Amino acid sequence: MLVNVFAPLYCRKPDEKFAEMLKQTEFTSDTPGGERIRCIDDNEEALLWRLRMIGAAKKSIVLATFDLRADESGTDLLAALNHAAEKGVEIKLLIDGIYQQLFLNGSKEFQALAARENVEVGVYNPVSPVGIFKLNYRMHDKYVIVDDKMYLLGGRNSNDIFLGDYTTDVNVDRDILVCDTTNGKGESLQELEAYFQQIWNEDCVKIKGGRKKNSSEISVSEE
């Protein structure tokens, strides 16, 4: 009991280097930035914005998610991605290995998307009998980047609990939509793209697809 009473009285002070990193000047500027932000709180709007972004893509799409399912909203996203791929848009899909194995390998829409030449699927830490001790190493990222111009980032997974109005069993969450007006020079956009590339290049990410049209690579679980 005494520990609980007196422990809050001790507060370790950050060292000078760390305190310098937390200065307000590191996060603010006197000049206007070139990125515009919109908060998205509604689940139906969250799905619509994802579909709008994917539909508007001309060059590239990056979609990273923890839990993508082949339910109503997930199928909407997969159909939109397939349509974008048909137009020649380069697509990179980064998904966590557990939910990919549970919910996607039997999806025809996912199989069709993964088989396209201009689509790469990266699976983070695929389920593997030899990697049982790394089973809890999961990726919870959730964002979409389109044409190096805009991104949507937040806490929503890619399924009916978080997107659309297909079910009454919903989760309350929020996304931030960021549009860059500086031709790809927006700082937060660049940081997110650099972060994605860092994760994409991790050894635990198994990448399938791209210019390889071997149908055996469509199933992206780890052998």
Where is each model-derived feature located?
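Charged, low-complexity intrinsically disordered terminal segments
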Residues: M1-V119, P129-D141, V146-E223
